Amino acid sequence: MKLERKAEIIAVGSELLLGQIVNTNAQFISRHLAEIGINVFYHTAVGDNPERLKQVIQTAQQRSDFIIFSGGLGPTKDDLTKETIAEVVGRPLKLDDEAFESIQDYFKKTNREMSPNNRKQALILEGSDVLPNRFGMAPGMLLEHESRFYMLLPGPPKELEPMFENEAKPLILEKLGSREKIVSRVLRFFGIGESQLETDLEDLIDAQTNPTIAPLAADGEVTLRLTAKHADPEETNRLLKETEDRILERVGEFFYGYDDTSLAEELAKACRSKGMTLAAAESFTGGLFSSWLTEMSGASEYFKGGAVCYTNELKVSAAGVSEDTLQRYGAVSAQCAKELAAGIRVKTGSDIGISFTGVAGPNTQEGHPAGKVFIGISVKDQAEEAFEFQFAGSRSAVRKRSAKYGCHLLLKMMEK
């Protein structure tokens, strides 16, 4: 079937309209469809009402040739996505034996009795390709009907995301009959804003064809998604590398990793590769930096420990800050940050100590405005350093930005 690649995503569920949950599914699906050259032109949310859902489907049929549904595949009476689509397209629902067996097995394994309405989850549109659900009960499906694709996916992201990546995406490519191999690579940057990055790369972004370059800013970071396509996989990778090299020639100092990595993960890798250990003394960040560094398995190889020194008394007893420093300069100061970093390094026997002291907000402290931050770094046999920042945003944003800058500073230090 010839597909014009005009897609629409319809999220089904009254909880979306009531603001009880955020529609992250539409974002996820749109991003993955863009990677394979399918353009999403419309996002629609509709409640659990068959008449309104019917109207939405009929509108989508007039403007889209690929209609994706998320939600409404459950066992309850208000889960009516399949039934409504079946009525609109004139296809009956039939029991999928494999899906039904999978549901029965689930209840046996969990020693629970299956309700009669769970059988409903194994019903599929006649003539559709079934998308197995490895993380739930309701299967998805892809139906070709009158020059359109209808894809039905479960609502919970933990079910939808693996189903889309592992089952739906390969099937879509097969249906499209494309010989081209589409590959994406995400470059991650920190310490540069989206507007500055786009300015530095303006000519490359304006001239993009293959690969395409898509910037995105989130949580104080900027990513560039490069997407290339070619029948020859080697040529696809060559196109990506050529564009990546041109980008990094200009803004490589801010680059820190690929795809789904994080600053904390890259810092953990750097510590491991250099055989260095780390400890942290945190005030207003409240252990956030330490929690990030210990999310990876085997964290004890590089992270010795830390202390949350919120009060001045603990800054003295847990990290060895002198009372004279606190009286003369205050807790929010470069001097305090240096002593915190040095003290925690010595107390834990680590190679590196890092500290965070500042004002998360919203109130001022010691005459400093909200967002004033000092990050201290102490490296064995080297002089301590302190870095001063003024961040904007909420209390949570200041804490996160500070912890990220701590990772960033240590990564840059290890590159020297």
Curated annotation (Swiss-Prot):
<dbReference type="InterPro" id="IPR036653">
    <property type="entry name" value="CinA-like_C"/>
</dbReference>
<dbReference type="InterPro" id="IPR001453">
    <property type="entry name" value="MoaB/Mog_dom"/>
</dbReference>
<protein>
    <recommendedName>
        <fullName>Putative competence-damage inducible protein</fullName>
    </recommendedName>
</protein>
<dbReference type="Pfam" id="PF02464">
    <property type="entry name" value="CinA"/>
</dbReference>
<dbReference type="Pfam" id="PF00994">
    <property type="entry name" value="MoCF_biosynth"/>
</dbReference>
<comment type="similarity">
    <text>Belongs to the CinA family.</text>
</comment>
<dbReference type="InterPro" id="IPR008136">
    <property type="entry name" value="CinA_C"/>
</dbReference>
<dbReference type="InterPro" id="IPR050101">
    <property type="entry name" value="CinA"/>
</dbReference>
<dbReference type="Pfam" id="PF18146">
    <property type="entry name" value="CinA_KH"/>
</dbReference>
<dbReference type="InterPro" id="IPR041424">
    <property type="entry name" value="CinA_KH"/>
</dbReference>
<dbReference type="InterPro" id="IPR036425">
    <property type="entry name" value="MoaB/Mog-like_dom_sf"/>
</dbReference>
<dbReference type="InterPro" id="IPR008135">
    <property type="entry name" value="Competence-induced_CinA"/>
</dbReference>
